[in-house]
Amino acid sequence: MAAAAVTAVAGVTSGSSRKRLLREEDMTKVEFETSEEVDVTPTFDTMGLREDLLRGIYAYGFEKPSAIQQRAIKQIIKGRDVIAQSQSGTGKTATFCVSVLQCLDIQVRETQALILAPTRELAGQIQKVLLALGDYMNVQCHACIGGTNVGEDIRKLDYGQHVVAGTPGRVFDMIRRRSLRTRAIKMLVLDEADEMLNKGFKEQIYDVYRYLPPATQVCLISATLPHEILEMTNKFMTDPIRILVKRDELTLEGIKQFFVAVEREEWKFDTLCDLYDTLTITQAVIFCNTKRKVDWLTEKMREANFTVSSMHGDMPQKERESIMKEFRSGASRVLISTDVWARGLDVPQVSLIINYDLPNNRELYIHRIGRSGRYGRKGVAINFVKNDDIRILRDIEQYYSTQIDEMPMNVADLI
């Protein structure tokens, strides 16, 4: 990952140059002037981190910071507003978790950092990473998510939490009820911001933001930076530093991508059954575009005596958690899901992704596929493509400057 071409640019202040920057974004490959301020810190030891946090980082198994960590952590710790763009699986969650933990005053049992994420699972995972990295710091951290008991949230928040990670709706609810006090908050992190700032979450984020102290530092982290994000960052950020992986580096290095041509929708199922033995070599995730399709496919696979588990946003929180737990432990090998799973969930053994349906939005492709080769691990992605999907596939190839070939017969050898 160290070879990733990362460029950075200090915040653009004048309106005309900002407009020019947005216009230039339209080009497939964006070149930025590297800002003088962004230097590369090659090791965790040289970042000026507290001793108890360093212990937690090494105990968690990190040895060397990834490209995004080498550039962003120091800037965030300095107190700068940061827009960080980094490919899925490059360690962006740990980037802001380390930065948040470094900036806490553990003696003060009040919420000092707020991290918003688009899904409950991702918020829960961020909480786990914070607790693991902060293992020697006695850090209090709570995941504030919908679908769980409100009373439990209130009790935890009353006890005092240094960091709250959560989904925007529930976090705003807790602020409104005065259970989550915002007076000591120093930092707001928006994770997977491309999804967060999609229409569904935009209003809720603004609602939360209005309650934060005016000097709050804002960090925004995302795999893709569509224009809407860059326009919005103007509203909540002061002279942000941008740390951007060049667009052509968002190709999915180490992940072999294939397609299987299926003439009709019905043929996808037969193709999947033929591939089942290949799927269970390690672990696989199969993506469908709708909850109904997930339920239908799960039932059909089970009728054909294949063992699969499934997850989507309509399932109760408890059920989703137990399915994830089974999948993480390896007890279940094949998970069928909607895009709720594609956002930042880290299951190291997953080395095969199947897009039963191509994603509706090309920016989701990297979130789905980036899942399978995390931290440089190899992975395989197989896209089922009907005749009328060819155009979408070509569009994805062009957007990510990548190549998707027809699946070879020996695909099992590649996993």
From Swiss-Prot:
InterPro entries recorded: DEAD/DEAH_box_helicase_dom (IPR011545), Helicase_ATP-bd (IPR014001), Helicase_C-like (IPR001650), P-loop_NTPase (IPR027417), RNA-helicase_DEAD-box_CS (IPR000629), RNA_helicase_DEAD_Q_motif (IPR014014)
Domain Helicase ATP-binding per the UniProt entry, residue ranges: 73-243
Binding site for ATP: 64, 69, 86-94, 346, 371-375
GO molecular function terms listed in the Swiss-Prot or TrEMBL record: ATP binding; ATP hydrolysis activity; RNA binding; RNA helicase activity
Gene Ontology terms describing biological process: mRNA splicing, via spliceosome; mRNA transport; nuclear-transcribed mRNA catabolic process, nonsense-mediated decay; regulation of alternative mRNA splicing, via spliceosome; regulation of translation
Sequence motif Q motif, residues: 42-70
Cellular component, GO annotation: cytoplasm; nuclear speck; nucleus; U2-type catalytic step 1 spliceosome
Motif window: DEAD box: 191-194
Function of the molecule: ATP-dependent RNA helicase. Involved in pre-mRNA splicing as component of the spliceosome. Core component of the splicing-dependent multiprotein exon junction complex (EJC) deposited at splice junctions on mRNAs. The EJC is a dynamic structure consisting of core proteins and several peripheral nuclear and cytoplasmic associated factors that join the complex only transiently either during EJC assembly or during subsequent mRNA metabolism.
Oligomeric form and interacting partners: Identified in the spliceosome C complex. Part of the mRNA splicing-dependent exon junction complex (EJC) complex; the core complex contains casc3, eif4a3, magoh and rbm8a.
Protein name, as recorded: Eukaryotic initiation factor 4A-III
Annotated organism of origin: Xenopus tropicalis (Western clawed frog)
Lineage summary: Eukaryota, Metazoa, Chordata, Craniata, Vertebrata
